[in-house]
UniProtKB/Swiss-Prot annotation:
Residues 1-23 have a biased composition (Low complexity). Transmembrane segments: none annotated. It comes from Rice dwarf virus (isolate Akita) (RDV). This is Non-structural protein 12A. It is found in: Host cytoplasm. Belongs to the phytoreovirus non-structural protein Pns12A family. It comes from the Viruses. Residues 1-37, 62-99, 111-161 are annotated as: Disordered. Residues 63-77, 122-134 have a biased composition (Basic and acidic residues). One of its GO terms (cellular component) is host cell cytoplasm. Constituent of viral factories. Binds to ssRNA and dsRNA. Keywords: Host cytoplasm. Residues 78-98 have a biased composition (Polar residues).
Amino acid sequence: MFKSGSGSLKRSGSISSVKSFSGDSEKGLPPISRGSVSIASQNSEPLIVPASSSSFAATSDFVPEKTKSEGNLKDKSSVITGNFGSSGPINAHTNQNADGDRLVENLLLKESSKGRGSGTSDARHTATDSRLSQEVKQSFSEENAGGNDLNTGRGSHGTGDGVEQHYKFDCEEGMSAYHKRVVDTFFKYFEYSAEDGHSTLYSDVMFLSGHGDLGLLVMSRYQELMTLRVRSAIYGIFCYLQALTAYLTYFDAKVGQAIMLDEELEKYEIRLDVAQDDDPIVFQITTGVFTSGVAHDLRKLTQILEAFSLER
């Protein structure tokens, strides 16, 4: 469960999530390049979380870099605007599932029908694309009458020791039905295996704020068998959006942008504009190369973000 603190929020702080990845030495698998998901105010120094174990990396190596110039950024940007809040206008998503469902379905099916080009003609991806349309159609053709049974297609990803259930209550409880429907559909798409089999991901996720006025919002540790690390980045995104909107209402982010900073390095960032401040919150995703399809998968991630940019 999220734990809220008391007191005023200091804008000089940051919220950071750090993820480290390990390979399988017995199987000869190399360590997977570490990735990070971070949110920080552009005017402040990021909060440094010291390493507490071999699988927990300090944030100092993964702090989003200052953008070199707005001009360069705009040249490579794919800007997406829309409402990212979980209260107020975001409820329109849950009340207008038909519109949202059609948008997400069209986005995913359109991309699926395009194919991947010569650079990503992987047979695994082709097989995944072939079943994507049916899974998406099935998911969005089922009406969410009860509003709660939205976690299908995930049981096989847990470790069998209650970790998945622990994550569910930590991060998913406050998600809107619309968020869950999109996430579930997106996760199904990533159920293909990595070339060298499953990789074990150890994640330490911390939600921290300011100089302690709100204190530790959430600290959850979980490990899960993952078929592709991009799924972890998606976990982080929706956890963060939920934490920001549900417990850091001071930010009251109304408009978001998904920007591709560097396609070759697979570097993306999300900017959340803050109503009370001209300074946007920067939410950056950086990953290394793991499979030939990672760049494509991150483009899918951008499409998911676009699904939340419905004009109201």
